[in-house]
Amino acid sequence: MIYRLSEYDENRAIGYYQIPVLKPCYYVPEQIIGFNYVKSWRKARDGIGVHFFLDDYQFERMWITPHRQIERLKDFSCVFTPDFSLFLDMPRAMKIWNVYRSRLIGQIMQDVGLKVIPTLSWGEEETFEFCFEGLEPGGVFTVSTRGVVRNKKAQGIWKTGMDFAIEKLKPKCILCYGVRIDYDFRDTEVKYFDARKCN
């Protein structure tokens, strides 16, 4: 088990679960690609962001060797925080652990000068007490709609969580990865990225 305790700073963590805090980011990328394409990407990197809306095994190395992976990310205009899974059937302890890991990696990336956009992810309502911890209001956030639109239960959970996120975080802009969803984002600016074109 890798804990990354040498990277953790209790003075930059918040709440009962001591989740690392991220500074807000106001950058909006023109295009995004998956982390799994970073190593082979040969095109221009200006205006390009890197997302982690992938199976966890494809970016677990961000936790195992973060500094080595960050070297490959430095030339991109921004990076999203890792989207570690928060499946409904996972024990709560694992969900908290995955939120902690995502924030800590985001903090490490910010410390070396990367523009970091927090990824919003949540499960059932009981997860709201920790899923949005460590995020300061007013910046740009990203979220995925994959697997949500065609599943009524998942769509309900997504909308409830997004309601909570907008109320708590008051985003300047939300970057949505996936298909458009029937949801009122109110006064929040929204930019969609088609998952089929984010390679």
Kindly label every feature range from the protein language model.
Residues P24-W41:
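N-terminal accessory interaction module
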Residues M1-C25, D187-N199:
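C-terminal accessory extensions appended to soluble enzyme cores
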Residues K39-R45, G49, L54, M62-N199:
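Eukaryote-skewed repeat-based solenoidal scaffolds used as protein-protein interaction platforms
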